[in-house]
Amino acid sequence: MPANDSQFLHWRKLADEARNTMAQVQKNDGLLIEVAAQHPLIDGVYPNPEFSARLDAAIKRYELERQNGEMVKLYVPGSRHMQDGVADQISLSAAGCNYLETHGVDPTDLYGEDANLKYKGDDGVYNSSDECYVATSLFRDLGFGRLASYCSPAQLMRKALSYIQFGVLPYMYSVPCEHMFHDYVDEAFIHIPVFLGDGTGLQVNSDEAKRLRELRKPVE
């Protein structure tokens, strides 16, 4: 048993409940794929190589599911971001959806800015947990049977924990590349402990969510 017994038991309970939920809904039709966005965009408009790699992996899955006669939709999260004071011209969602459409994905199979606004309002989608919250909300409200997430290898555990906190457990797929935004050591010793200590899934009244929003949301 881990040193922090109560925290371990709490998360074990959440994980078991999430698995039970997925077992109950697997009879439903359809797969929802969340493609974790990655800032900054190239020239403020185009997905960077890490983001593009995830989108390419999702496209392959999309095409395979369609070939097998399955219904599949994709959600690309992410509001308009800034980094080091430089703001992207469009949202991560718009950049990702544009990329997917250009590579043959039916635009009617895409969720992006509309979902961000519906579930996060003016707060926007500015961290991994926001991404998972919106994807979970879409998954529940639209009655999908399966959920998949494509993300950074270093980011995968924290995103899985976010999903578990929101009551679901997707099929998690990591997409490696040479230069990654997320760092394994930072995740293990900074970001995951902060997430576990937050208690809200970085949602309502979260100090960490507020910090990230102030860091990444452009000043209009």
Where are these regions (language model features)?
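Glycine-rich flexible loop motifs, especially short His-Gly-Gly/GGXG/HXGH segments used as catalytic or interaction
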Residues: 185-220
